[in-house]
Amino acid sequence: MIKNICAGLLILCQSSFNFQDDFEYNNNEEFIKGVKNCALFYNADLPSKDRIPIEIIVGQASLESDWGRSRFALEGNNLYGMREYDLTEPHIKPLENLEANFGLKVYPTKCLSVVHYIETLLSHRSYAEFRENMYNMWVVDEYDIFLLTEMLYNYSADKDYAVKLRRTILYITERGYLNGRK
């Protein structure tokens, strides 16, 4: 409960935030700060039981976009590898599969990519088990980030995805990137 109040107060102090604004970064720490700010601001408007842990949001953005350096992140503000199957919508085709029946979604800003990712985890049937576990952790106010990463097995075809995500989250937390200390 206290964590939720603190997150809400932090957001209120950053009231000039706008999802239409983009963030810039020159290194991993700046990238994490940008993603974190987008996530905190959006999470503040969600019921506390629906707030995706920041470690997972930042960890997946870092893993999926190579710390914001991937072609899809640079050209399409797509930090999570989100696909677009309606090819009349803005998208970028994967270079290795130009004939694919999908592209990767293009977003006006990186923050809107973060919002879409959060909404996907909160609504898509593939992540029902993730949501159920997250809710149970919310009830007792004790989150096991690494157990939650196991529930994201549908996010990638890579059978080692959860292991890679855990390593990325450990890298981020051990360096204090989420706390603003390096």
Model-derived features: positions:
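Sec-dependent signal peptide recognition
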Residues: M1-G8
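Catalytic cores of secreted/periplasmic lytic hydrolases that degrade extracellular macromolecules
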Residues: G8, S16-G59, L63-K182
